[in-house]
Regions:
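Short, well-structured N-terminal submotif of metal-dependent ribonuclease cores
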Residues: 1-40, 54-60, 121, 130
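Acidic active-site catalytic centers that drive phospho-/nucleotidyl reactions
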Residues: 6, 47, 96, 115
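Conserved glycosyltransferase catalytic-site signature
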Residues: 7, 80, 96-100
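Acidic catalytic patch
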Residues: 43-44, 64-90
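Active-site-proximal, substrate-binding regions of enzyme catalytic domains
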Residues: 25, 49-74
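Acidic, PIN/NYN-like endoribonuclease modules and their adjacent C-terminal/linker elements
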Residues: 2, 72, 101-132
Length: 132
């Protein structure tokens, strides 16, 4: 199974953000055990790095964590077409629309997110971390 994990779920796991961290950490374990293929978008990677560095107040520690994250996840490119197509998406949040376009183009089975309502207008199946 191939899943695209939204930024909020990655941050939940990496910062032990309660009450969501347990289900997010379970997804990481599934990826580590090769039960699933876990992906993030390239644009999410920069957001994740920024948020982790801000949380830790430590650039080197943030880089180390990102390296570990990259060992568990594939990184999906965001194309110009993804960005352009997202402008016409029924998903009102542009960033979420871009993520959904990437997931659709890469044939992801699910987008795993806590932000279900923003993705419902897209064509990719959406699931909460607790339900995954």
């Amino acid at each position: 199974m191939r899943i695209l994990v939204d930024t909020n779920v990655i941050i939940d796991a990496l910062t032990s953000r309660e009450p969501w961290n347990k289900s997010a950490e379970e997804i990481f374990l599934m990826a580590a055990n090769h039960t699933i293929e876990m992906y993030i978008t390239a644009s999410s990677a920069t957001d994740i790095y920024y948020l982790i560095r801000k949380h830790l107040h430590n650039t080197e520690a943030a880089k180390m964590i990102m390296g570990k994250l990259y060992s568990l996840t594939g990184i999906l490119e965001v194309t110009a077409d993804d960005c352009m197509d997202a402008l016409a998406s029924a998903i009102s949040d542009y960033e979420d629309a871009v993520v959904e376009k990437v997931a659709s183009r890469k044939d992801m089975d699910y987008i795993v997110t806590r932000n279900i309502k923003d993705y419902q207008a897209g064509g990719t199946k959406i699931i909460l971390p607790d339900d995954f």
